[in-house]
Every structure is written in structure tokens, then in C-alpha cells.
């Protein structure tokens, strides 16, 4: 069974949050879904290799690109080759594409996310939210917490993020 079927994906905006596989999940969903798909972000994301990147505030350009490619990536260029949210409102993109899949959380490539109070950046228009956690987090109980959990706790407690104030513990399996 396809992942998009297991998630009961519906047309419209879907936010993907968490850590350890969000970007990979976006790519898989784009491949599996029938219909037009826009991959984008409400935070930061790297462009997808092999998927056309569109930077525009012209909805007609978006429609033409979707007619040619079926799957596109959209965003606004930012530092370090990353993209931020697209210039067009997400609701406008949802009118142009069957699916708009939004990476709505950052985790700095760590396998587990402890969100701060203002995270994740889930759009009010999102019809569904998919939470992701990397399975690698289950095997790292012996490593310092700060080395595998994105530090949302730091900003909530105003204390340095250390293992002593880490409230997330991976199960110990041998």
C-alpha cells in the first residue's frame, strides 16, 4: 500500500512536521499522488533535485508549470541555497494544484524534534497534519540528548539546552 493511501491524503494543503524524514516524505508523496502537486515550506527547505523550482508571484505561471510538470517546488530564495515560503498565499496555491504539501517545521537534520512554543508553523488552511520522527532516535539513548533532539526547549526555559534539562528520553532497547 502506498504511503499516501496509508495517510488517507486528501486534496488541499497538508503540513508535514517533526523531524527525521520530512523532506523524504514530501518527495515520496509527490511521486505517489495522482494529480498536480506543489512542494513548499512555511519555514526553510532546500530545493528538490530533479523537481522543477518555480519562484514567482504569478499564479498563471504556476498553472502553466503544473500543466507541464505535474510536480513543482515553490519558494522564495533565502540564505545558504534554501527556500522560504512562496510569494503567493498558500490558499492561492491550493486553488491551482490538487495537493500543496508544506514542510512546516525545521529540525536541522536531527532525528527528533522538541518544538518551541511557536513551532511548528502549521498553516490555518491545512486540511491535514502529518507528524514525522526519525527511527534513528530510538537507537541513540546512550548519546547526549542535545546531539539528537532539536532544541525547542532552550527557548522555552531560557536555559542552555543540555541533557540535564532534556525532557525527552528515547526508549532503551537492546
Task: Please tell me what each predicted stretch does.
Residues 68-72, 95-100, 128:
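Loop/turn-to-beta-strand initiation segments
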Residues 30-80:
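N-terminal phosphate/diphosphate-binding loop that engages ATP/GTP or pyrophosphate donors
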Residues 16-17, 37-41, 73-76, 100-104, ...:
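General beta-strand structural signal in soluble alpha/beta enzymes
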Residues 6-10, 63-67, 92-94, 120-124:
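Solvent-exposed alpha-helices and their adjacent loops that cap or buttress functional pockets
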Residues 19-24, 44-45, 106-108:
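Gly/Ser/Thr-rich loops at beta-strand to alpha-helix junctions
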Residues 12, 35-36, 96-98, 127:
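Short coil/turn segments at beta-strand junctions that form active-site/ligand-binding loops
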Residues 81-96, 105-174:
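Conserved catalytic-core segment of NTP-binding enzymes
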Residues 1-35:
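Walker A (P-loop) phosphate-binding motif
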Amino acid at each position: 500500500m502506498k504511503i499516501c493511501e496509508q495517510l488517507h491524503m486528501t486534496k488541499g494543503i497538508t503540513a508535514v512536521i517533526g523531524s527525521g524524514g520530512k523532506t523524504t516524505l514530501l518527495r515520496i508523496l509527490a511521486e505517489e499522488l495522482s494529480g498536480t502537486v506543489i512542494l513548499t515550506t512555511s519555514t526553510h527547505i532546500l530545493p528538490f533535485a530533479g523537481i522543477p523550482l518555480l519562484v514567482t508571484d504569478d499564479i498563471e505561471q504556476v498553472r502553466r508549470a503544473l500543466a507541464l510538470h505535474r510536480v513543482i517546488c515553490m519558494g522564495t530564495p533565502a540564505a545558504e541555497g534554501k527556500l522560504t515560503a512562496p510569494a503567493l498565499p498558500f490558499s492561492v496555491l491550493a486553488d491551482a494544484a490538487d495537493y500543496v504539501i508544506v514542510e512546516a517545521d525545521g529540525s536541522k537534520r536531527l532525528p527528533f524534534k522538541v518544538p518551541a512554543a511557536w513551532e511548528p508553523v502549521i498553516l490555518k488552511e491545512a486540511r491535514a497534519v502529518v507528524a514525522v520522527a526519525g527511527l534513528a532516535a530510538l537507537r541513540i539513548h546512550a548519546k547526549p540528548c542535545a546531539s539528537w533532539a532539536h532544541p525547542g526547549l532552550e527557548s522555552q526555559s531560557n536555559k542552555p539546552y543540555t541533557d540535564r534539562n532534556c525532557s525527552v528520553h528515547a526508549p532503551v532497547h537492546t
